[in-house]
Amino acid sequence: MAEAKVLSGAGLRGQVAGQTALSTVGQSGAGLTYRGYDVRELAADAQFEEVAYLLLYGELPTQAQLDAYLDKLGKLRDLPQALKEVLERIPADAHPMDVMRTGCSFLGNIEPENDFSEQHDKTDRLLAAFPAIMCYWYRFSHEGKRIDCVSDERTIGGHFLHLLHDKKPSELHVKVMNVSLILYAEHEFNASTFAARVCASTLSDLFSCVTAAIGTLRGPLHGGANEAAMEMIARFSSPEDAIKGTLGMLERKDKIMGFGHAIYKENDPRNEVIKAWSKKLADEVGDTVLFPVSEAIDKTMWEQKKLFPNADFYHASTYHFMGIPTKLFTPIFVCSRLTGWAAHVFEQRANNRIIRPSAEYTGVEQRKFVPIEQR
């Protein structure tokens, strides 16, 4: 047997763990692409549902295909009564990612993927249902209201905002949600996506793969950076206060979320897009604190550490300006990244071999067993 090659690098940094045709991350001249399209162009000109179709079905849809896809998703939004009853049993202080994980897993019990030929339909079902899973639990546990899980909003972003706020969202807010969902849709072999592919490599069902991904995204080193960023930004009352506070955090070597990236070395292309929309929302509401504070932290981090904001940092203020509770920031990520997760599951299934790496042993040398009476 040939000796296995030992790969160094904490967290498998820099290691190629497989092939994908779905996205490129950090390549020179095109920081992030989905099936060859620059994410900045998609965010400027496409609907999220077009991007979902691109990732899941391989090409951008025609107008007729997009209309049919929107119709399909619209009919799949309502939740089974049994799932609503499960969501009503989850307490208000539960972690919202636990809610998403449970909702996904339970839906897989009552609407299972019986054959891989159903993978697209089951993904579309989850894509349509996730906003309602999040909002039904949140509105019931926090307000005691059993909401209607169906709305007349055409888009997933608009539908989510309608369910959350119980009113028709503004065109600006729908547009911003659309952009946000596009920016978070896919990102190559990140931790949650790789978890989904490992699960898929065992030929497990789609719901198990997505549940594994949600559980992985739940960890604070992967998901939750925008929530942590919001909590930090909210501490400061002015740009001057933010600069002083950030310098203090750096001196104490505190973890400052929302900056730097494992792959991007110069900038995160998603940041420039969402920052511009955060500024538009700040202007809309007449904000004179949150966005200036964010910019002050941004500037200080670059001056002191040459660290740039990633996609999560300005998403914090963006979501806040739209009235989205901080605890729901990461579940929104789930509603978007589902498209990337599922596309990777499809890709893994199409050319599968079970993912089973080796480990470099660092324990004691082989030794003789000692009977218990002699120990």
Enumerate the language-model features and the residues they cover.
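Non-transmembrane, aqueous-exposed alpha-helical and coiled segments at domain scale
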Residues: 1-375
